[in-house]
Amino acid sequence: MAPSVMASSATTVAPFQGLKSTAGMPVARRSGNSSFGNVSNGGRIRCMQVWPIEGIKKFETLSYLPPLTVEDLLKQIEYLLRSKWVPCLEFSKVGFVYRENHRSPGYYDGRYWTMWKLPMFGCTDATQVLKELEEAKKAYPDAFVRIIGFDNVRQVQLISFIAYKPPGCEESGGN
């Protein structure tokens, strides 16, 4: 284009003057004999915890909580139903992802559990889901049972949590 057609709107920007002074900030001062100075997270120790790397398996969405009571399960199922999701129960002897047949992920590596009966289309009562959970626990007492919430409009699973852990399982909590 011709130079006369283009309108130039140059703006001036102040040159970079460096970072703001940190003199007013509460920072530990470094000592001259150490490259790290007096670095300390002592003030934060009360609020930080480290997850143990052995002995506690993480299973599903709510696995960081203590085992769910019947009342807790009812509340979760009622939330699932209020959200217009279809409840479904699944079970598995191994409650976590594993690879047995191949190094790469595949269909039979523990991500897919066996469905207990059919999805509970039309279910409106949380106690119906709990009755199915009790039946699944009686039929497979040594299996993990989880409840999932399926959105049949978007065709996706939106919630999943362990509802029963078999006795003797790490962190089973007697649920």
UniProtKB/Swiss-Prot annotation:
Region (Interaction with large subunit): 60-64
Function description: RuBisCO catalyzes two reactions: the carboxylation of D-ribulose 1,5-bisphosphate, the primary event in carbon dioxide fixation, as well as the oxidative fragmentation of the pentose substrate. Both reactions occur simultaneously and in competition at the same active site. Although the small subunit is not catalytic it is essential for maximal activity.
Main localization category: plastid
Pfam families from the UniProt entry: RbcS (PF12338), RuBisCO_small (PF00101)
MF terms in GO: ribulose-bisphosphate carboxylase activity
UniProt keyword terms in alphabetical order: Calvin cycle, Carbon dioxide fixation, Chloroplast, Photorespiration, Photosynthesis, Plastid, Transit peptide
Extra remark beyond the main annotation: NADPH and 6-phosphogluconate function as positive effectors to promote enzyme activation.
Organism: Oryza sativa subsp. japonica (Rice)
InterPro entries per record: RuBisCO_ssu, RuBisCO_ssu_dom, RuBisCO_ssu_N, RuBisCO_ssu_sf
Complex and partners: Heterohexadecamer of 8 large and 8 small subunits.
Superkingdom of the source species: Eukaryota
Gene3D superfamilies: Ribulose bisphosphate carboxylase, small subunit
Taxon lineage: Eukaryota, Viridiplantae, Streptophyta, Embryophyta, Tracheophyta
Transit peptide region: 1-46, 1-47
Name of the coding gene: RBCS
A GO CC term assigned to this protein in UniProt: chloroplast
GO BP annotations, alphabetical order: photorespiration; reductive pentose-phosphate cycle
The protein's name in its UniProt record: Ribulose bisphosphate carboxylase small subunit, chloroplastic 1
The family this protein is said to belong to: Belongs to the RuBisCO small chain family.
Subcellular location: Plastid, Chloroplast
